[in-house]
Amino acid sequence: DRVTLEVFRGCIRGCRFCQAGFICRPVREKSPEVLCRQAKESVDATGYDEISMCCLSISDYSHIASFTDGLLGWTDDARVNISLPSMRADSFTRELMDKISSVRTSTLTFAPEAGSPRLRDVINKNITEEEIMRACGITFAAGKNQVKLYFMNGLPHETDEDIAGIAELAEHVIDKYYATPEANKKRRPQVTISVACFIPKPHTPFEREPQALPEVLLEKQQFLSSCIHDRKIRYNYHDVDVSRIEAVFARGDRRLGAAILEAVKCGAVFDAWTEFFDYNRWLEIFEKCGLDPAFYANRTIPDDEILPWDVIDCGVSKDFLIRERHKAAEAIATPSCKDKCSACGANSLAPNKACRWCPGGDAGDDSVPHIVPEPGEMSASAPKPDVSERPIRTVRLRFAKKGALAYIGHLDLVNALSRVMIRSGLPV
């Protein structure tokens, strides 16, 4: 129930577990003018009061300042909430925090992904604990008392020390809150750590790495839980059985088509909902089709084995993925595309050098004019008229719920009426 606005596509970072970061290369950004127009038109057309920014890292958008200035021209008065994706801690600045604090935002999210510097080098998450603490300090200084941290367990080359480091990092964030002079000490801090299970994905350097068995993943989750001793830390984790089924289909081949058909016949059609998911039923389906889940999810695939998805060319070369896999085993990080081209091959997708950071590529024009709100839009810095001076008219509406709509719930009805008012453009 929100507007989804794609800010840009692709990523310059190269996290070795992230499929979207590789298959969506090279980076392509929308201009701030296009984004602001699409956001306004979408809210006017749908009546939604929330805009969700869709991208891999909003703080990596090269024109974030101009974009947020354009949004501030109308979202504040329209009471439109801005939902932000996870931030890169190393590119999060006080200037960006000041801008997003001017609009109604949800809890800020950062994604360290691993609890130790060594494992972050393994997965190529090029951020340090100092950068994470600095980003959290900026958040707390702006009056926020909550942050979310995303992690993964079961990563390749992971140890118990890496898992315990997740709890230690969360505790350091709590300490950072109390060490920040500008923080609002009247409210208790809260750090939410959300830990997902590693799932090997095609077209990533970790596509050949195994997923840990469900019982091993469960042990890792329980171990992390035992390391958390502060009630100000909230721990969320994913279902290991669901993650294993996801891993089976992530690295599956055409033989899984028979399993999907059999699953539909067995009634497994709403398994995205936890109450309908039945892990044992899936095991029975695989057995009936003569398939071994461990073959797909839990084995290491040699470098010379042909993969089912090798017929798909996403632009990133197979040799590059294998090189990155070997660098991960030695905990060697690869710099971002902005710092140094790693010759991934994505630049071959377009004859005019689509990758802006590749040698000889078209870097484009980074100069973007400041966006001025259209006439009639409220500027974020402009003085707002006194509401008491506006003429007030009372309008009474009578309506009835008929037909199938007679069964609509009360909350859904209230939300529908609210969206109708927004779409009408009435100054309510």
List the predicted regions and their residue ranges.
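Flexible glycine/acidic-rich beta-alpha junction loops that bind and position SAM and/or redox cofactors
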Residues: 62-63, 92-96, 118-123, 153-161, ...
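Radical SAM enzyme core and accessory elements
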Residues: 229-384
